[in-house]
């Protein structure tokens, strides 16, 4: 399952991207769970409480308050595994997007071919990461522990 976040201050843009993602993933027979956020602050607040529960985030750059680039920098400080894609009408930020390790940069309005390409890369990266990490869930969230850092497992009455 691919867990996706869409962060855009435009409800219309979120709805359109959500519909496109659902259509494209349905064609690929990939289950998805999509979360919507109207601000960078909302996204960061949710991610703080739900660590590791989103795999891929589509971010608008120009938003009121915390913009998408600032949100991406904060997200990147918390996780290198989270995949970031900028969806914006501005070309000025292309190089900034790659500085935070963005998976892609899509111009508005997004086209199915562009989003399909991003999904192909996101799914390939997720598949590759699944071989490299051990997923562990506890009351604080979902954690991806690199397998190479695991020395042993210990279970206490479980």
Summary of predicted features, one role per range:
Residues 10-35, 77:
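Two-component/phosphorelay signaling modules centered on CheY-like receiver
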Residues 44-49, 53-128:
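CheY-like receiver
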Residues 37, 106, 145:
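Hydrophobic residues at beta-strand termini and immediately following loops
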Residues 34-42:
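Conserved Asp/Asn-Gly motif in the active-site loop of CheY-like receiver
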């Amino acid at each position: 399952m691919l867990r996706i976040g869409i962060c855009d201050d435009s409800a219309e843009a979120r709805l359109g991207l959500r519909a496109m993602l659902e259509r494209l993933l349905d064609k690929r027979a990939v289950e998805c769970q999509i979360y919507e956020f109207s601000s960078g602050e909302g996204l960061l607040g949710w991610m703080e409480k739900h660590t590791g529960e989103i795999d891929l985030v589509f971010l608008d750059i120009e938003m009121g308050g915390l913009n998408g680039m600032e949100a991406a920098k904060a997200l990147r400080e918390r996780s290198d595994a989270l995949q970031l894609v900028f969806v914006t009408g501005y070309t000025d930020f292309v190089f900034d997007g790659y500085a935070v390790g963005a998976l892609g940069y899509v111009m508005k309005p997004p086209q199915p071919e562009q989003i399909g390409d991003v999904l192909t890369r996101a799914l390939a990266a997720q598949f590759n990461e699944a071989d490299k990490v051990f997923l562990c869930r506890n009351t604080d969230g979902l954690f991806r522990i690199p397998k190479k850092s695991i020395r042993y497992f210990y279970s206490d009455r479980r």
